[in-house]
């Protein structure tokens, strides 16, 4: 892969984590698909035993004005955060977790023009965190991240916009 390739960057980051002493198991699964998540959990259980914590960072930025957005397009944006969180909750209901971190966005609080689905998905994470903290002993935190400078959806969106402008 090219040095600037997204896959190469991810591989370098994983190798750096491994050099620091972590055991890493990479699994490709759609967090919104319960069957895929059950298969992933089975592999994790076989490799490591019990899960002690979760960092849920899946998401799709989406975009487009609500007046012209289709239900299918909104569902694609909502699914990783809403269905994904619910799937993780169901899948790990019988597991005592030390922590459950949800990577939300400041857009849940501020809103972003043209991203009603993304804002709603992140608001769901915040509400889910509140619910879990009031009904379980698992520390559940929803972090309202702002734009990251070097990684994440915002960087990819800007790169995509740059490519369209250059053409």
Where are these regions (language model features)?
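4′-phosphopantetheine-dependent carrier domains
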Residues: 1-167
């Amino acid at each position: 892969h090219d040095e600037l390739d997204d896959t190469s960057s991810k591989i370098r980051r994983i190798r750096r984590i491994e050099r620091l002493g972590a055991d890493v198991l990479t699994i490709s699964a759609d967090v919104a698909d319960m069957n895929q998540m059950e298969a992933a959990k089975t592999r994790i259980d076989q490799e490591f035993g019990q899960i002690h914590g979760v960092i849920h960072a899946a998401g799709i930025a989406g975009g487009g004005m609500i007046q012209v957005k289709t239900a299918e397009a909104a569902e694609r944006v909502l699914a990783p955060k809403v269905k994904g969180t619910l799937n993780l909750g169901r899948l790990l209901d019988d597991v005592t977790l030390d922590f459950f971190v949800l990577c939300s966005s400041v857009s849940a609080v501020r809103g972003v023009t043209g991203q009603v689905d993304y804002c709603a998905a992140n608001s769901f994470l915040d509400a889910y965190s509140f619910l879990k903290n009031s009904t379980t002993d698992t520390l559940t935190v929803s972090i309202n991240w702002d734009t990251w400078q070097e990684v994440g959806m915002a960087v990819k969106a800007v790169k995509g916009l740059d490519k369209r402008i250059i053409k």
